Amino acid sequence: MPAKKRKTTRQRRRSKARSASANTAALRKVSKERDQARRKLRAAQKKLAKAKKDASRKLAKLRKEAARKVAAAKKTRAPSKKGRKKATRKKGGGRSRKTARKVSTMKRGRGRPRKKA
């Protein structure tokens, strides 16, 4: 049986190149998978954002409609009731605008209450 032939440098180089190409192929596969996953995630995020927008839009629409209905109901209320209400309602005092408001009144009710001496 003849002895095993030694590989020539050219053969050695070729095999090395092949292994390198295999490595790059694996890398390519991994990067492809990563890109696919990224794309999927992006699509899902877009879908979610769209759903959120739609939901908020629907809510706003409903709110507007409800407000409109309430306003309409108020308009159609009996006028006698309205008049009665106006007559019995007490007007708020409000603040007198003769003098500027004191700073102490602004601070009232903040922090620790003062001791009554």
UniProtKB/Swiss-Prot annotation:
Skewed-composition ranges (Basic and acidic residues): 51-68
UniProt-annotated stretches for the region Disordered: 1-117
Gene Ontology MF terms: DNA binding
Listed Basic residues bias regions: 1-17, 39-50, 71-117
Keywords: DNA-binding
Role played: Binds DNA in vitro.
Protein name: Histone-like protein Hq1
Organism from which the protein derives: Coxiella burnetii (strain RSA 493 / Nine Mile phase I)
